Amino acid sequence: SLLERIGGEGSSADEAEEMENISVKRVQPDETEEWESFLQQSPLTLYLEMSSENYHRADLLGVALSDGEQHLFLDWETAAGWEAFAQWLQDPEREKWCYDIKGNQVALRRQGLSSDGYSFDVMLASYLINASDSAHQLSDIAQRRQIGGLPEDEAVYGKGAKRRQLTGQELAEHLARKVHTIHQLKPILEKELQENHLDALFFELELPITHVLARMELAGVQVDRERLQQLGEELREH
């Protein structure tokens, strides 16, 4: 079971049980109009699931959206055909919390969709706060904050040649757990950024740079990651 894959005790185990029984609405193509009012909320949490970690080549499998209470899932075909979703994505006034802005922007642009309005990225925040850690998967970030209930992708999909693709309800629930976790992490990470005096660096430098890097990658500009990391270290020291 999911609980066995996660383990944990106390409140973490309670959260794991809540996550195992997570409620998610699978929006069908003929139901999208009913959910347009949901997109009027701001902020919303967004998660895009891809077929691999290489967002330059990966297929988009599905989308999860959450307001913290309700979790929606759409397979990619349904999401791609939903005009109101495309408008919401590109609206800078509609706040979006996510995991990996750059990956989202590149993957969506490859599908002909622009996206804007990202106000928080839990992966980027984790890189700043836990710079010495190499593990920044969403499940790693949650585990470090004692947020239970999200299994590692490898535990869900399998590894290498044994990797399988999820579909239907199984995929919907996995993405609902991810989007719910992002929603939980956002205020925690924002507080950690403030406590570590990294909030100005995050909001005034790192977030804007992420948008620039996405555009550069889409344009095919080679990015010297090591040099950028070095610059980041120098900026943190000042």
Regions found by a protein language model. Name each.
Residues 1-88:
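Long, highly charged low-complexity segments
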Residues 3-6, 129, 232:
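A general structural motif at alpha-helix termini
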Residues 8-15, 133-141, 233-238:
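Compositionally biased, low-complexity linear motifs
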Residues 20-24, 64-195, 202-213:
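Active-site-proximal helix-loop-helix substrate-binding element of RNase H-like nuclease domains
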Residues 46-49, 66-68, 99-100, 219, ...:
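Generic beta-strand/beta-sheet core signal
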Residues 201-238:
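Extended, well-ordered alpha-helical scaffold/bundle regions in very large, multi-domain proteins
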